[in-house]
Amino acid sequence: MTLHRPMLIALLIALVPAMAAAQKTSYDFDKAATFSTYKSYAFKDGTPAGQPLIDQRIVAALESELKAKGLTKNDSNPDVFVLYHVAMDKQKDISSYSTGPMYGGYGYGWGGGWGATTTDVRVRDILVGTLAVDVVDAKKKQIAWRGLGTKEIDTTAKPEKRDKNIAGAVTKIMKNYPPKVKS
């Protein structure tokens, strides 16, 4: 199957914004932590988003993920404390694409040959959010695991989309909890 140049350009134009909006995640952990003994959790104060509805969505998504991983909520005597931190940052998004040289075909006279290239550049202001989730050993009072997720925020999203975005972000961040410890 051969892609024609206009179709290839259209495909690239469609994919670039999708790749730019992808969430980046990472995690780190204390290799001495005994994750298999962590059975219960309680939330501690972190750095909330400052928007109660967003904070409620984050807590609900974390509760769902922790429950799926076998942890139960225990506010009086938890094995770990879970904290989350939210940061927002305005950034510039600069993207460009070039059409590349165009071939005009064969022929005599002034009509044939290669054409000029054009490059389009787009600069826009974006809001990037970072969500950090800390799992702190309640007895040692030390961070056992930290997950981070960074993504462009869609400020025009409807509530249902925000629910989905936050739940998806938390799921992706918590994917590597507990970490697979190599012996």
Task: Give the role of each language-model region.
Residues 1-13:
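Bacterial N-terminal signal peptides that target proteins for export
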Residues 18-69, 75-93, 180-183:
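A structural "domain/chain start" motif
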Residues 4, 22-33, 123-130, 137-183:
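C-terminal/domain-edge helix-coil "capping" segments
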Residues 44-53, 70-71, 119-121, 153-160:
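Second-shell loop/turn segments in exported
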Residues 60-64, 100-105, 152-154, 164-168:
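Short, low-complexity, polar/charged sequence segments that are solvent-exposed and flexible
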